[in-house]
Amino acid sequence: MNKQESDILNALLLEPFINQRILAEVSGHSLGVVNRSLKELIKAGYLNEAISPTAKAVSEYKNKTPKRAIILAAGFGMRMVPINTEMPKGLLEVNGEPLIERIIKQLHEVGIQEIYVVVGFMKEKYEYLMDEYGVELVINPDYASKNNLHSLKLVKEHLENAYIVPCDIWCDRNPFHRHELYSWYMVSDLVENESNVRVNRKMELVTVPENAGGNAMVGISYLIKEDADTVSNRIEELCKKPQYDGSFWEEALYKKDRMIVTARVVHSADVVEINTYEQLREIDSDSNQLKTDAIRLICKALCAKPEDVTDITVLKKGMTNRSFLFTCKDKKYIMRIPGEGTDQLINRRQEAAVYHAIADKNICDDIAYINPENGYKITEFLEGARVCDPTDYEDVKKCMSRLRDFHAMKLKVAHEFDIFGQMEFYETLWDGTPSVYKDYEKTKANVWSLKPYIDAHAGEKILTHIDAVPDNFLFVQKNGKEEIRLIDWEYAGMQDPHVDIAMFCIYSLYNKRQVDRLIAAYFTDGCDDATRIKIYCYIA
């Protein structure tokens, strides 16, 4: 049976035949398709001459009936900033109802009780679903490093006659049915550049060139046994290859230039994927999740209203923080929300003290707000900024000149960045677990052997950036002039300023010749041997 024949047989299994015109309306196909399909179904033994389903049709019907569902809810929902700092995406509320609860209720409406929810990020917040709805939670421990292809691998033995559903969608009408006769993947009639597929005349999902535009991929799918087996085997193969760690599960549906399942097309207004704060605001401006601490803080700091906060975009860069770009009153800002566990690594009170010390000195990005308790920070976005290119010696000379000028200010704060003390502190975070590196103890001993020389030649300690790497030097245009701003002062403290020179070299992956060239750029009047050796020690 092809898709049209399956649709028509499905309609006849639900309601008795009256005439072809009504059947065309119910099935969504033309009179010509209905007439042709009825002949084929009779010929294949699925219908008798009275156009009633045969025992063969009923058997097919039962064999392909939906039995279970898998809801994918493990991911961060990175684009949902700032909501994802407080709530996993599946629990976002629309009209007072969590997305995942609506999905579960819609599944229950069509008789599906066997439901697996794959969780990871904030998994404990989903635990109530087990008691309230009888679902089974499956934990994906790799949610932070791998995409949902790996989530589906954990439940691949349950793919037969199963719906696969993302947790971040809101369906106006129930997208599930008591009966299905073929596998499908849901797309909408909306054209998006992000989509990889489009629907052709045969209702196949064929791939499109990047940014060529295709049907928006909703993410809901249904798999009958034959296709479930194929997808399960494909998932197993793909998950063995590291290049697919970041892949979506749909990767397992492709064979050459198309998906192995047919398209199910819905109107774009019937199914809404909620990926961003603003998409949630569009569908439900009164949603409880819109009232986040971050938005309230922005409004207070910038004397704004929630509706003034627009164009929210996640910024993935940063080792320890979750940051996002936003616009407020026609001005762009970046908000930093410290990541989990960063309070162990960074003293936010000390960081705030550093920003107080460098305020109004035109050294860093402009701070609109900083909280010394939780580390929340709002800075003005530097439009058109670029980072230093460590392979461009002109860039390097300008950055070293800027660094030298900062050091010449000899600013003071009340705390010190103790390099060797920090090494010992980081070891305490291991909780007694030995290093995975076999030569760690030997390397550590070599490093500590340098301490006497460093202590003897450190000189005066002043406010030092500590993280003066190329990416933290920003070139910006201000009033027609080029300026260099030094950003990210989380680790700054009192220390030998020459540590900053060493850090630039380390993160630039310089060899000795390049290190000496950088030292020459900083010490324009020459560098004595003792200082040069000390910088080598810091690099080591």
Residue ranges and their predicted role:
Residues 9-14, 20-22, 26-27, 56-123:
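N-terminal glycine-rich phosphate-binding loop and ensuing alpha1 helix
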Residues 13-16, 51-69, 216-301:
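Conserved alpha/beta core of the MobA/IspD/sugar-nucleotide pyrophosphorylase nucleotidyltransferase superfamily
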Residues 19, 172-248:
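Conserved core of the sugar-phosphate nucleotidyltransferase
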Residues 126-196:
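Conserved beta-loop-beta/alpha segment of the NTase-like Rossmann-fold superfamily
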Residues 256-257, 276, 522-540:
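Helix-rich C-terminal or lid/interface subdomains of diverse kinases
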Residues 293-311, 411-466, 470, 476-478, ...:
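An alpha-helical support segment within catalytic cores of ATP-dependent transferases
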Residues 498-528:
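Active-site activation/catalytic loop segments of kinase-like enzymes and analogous catalytic loops
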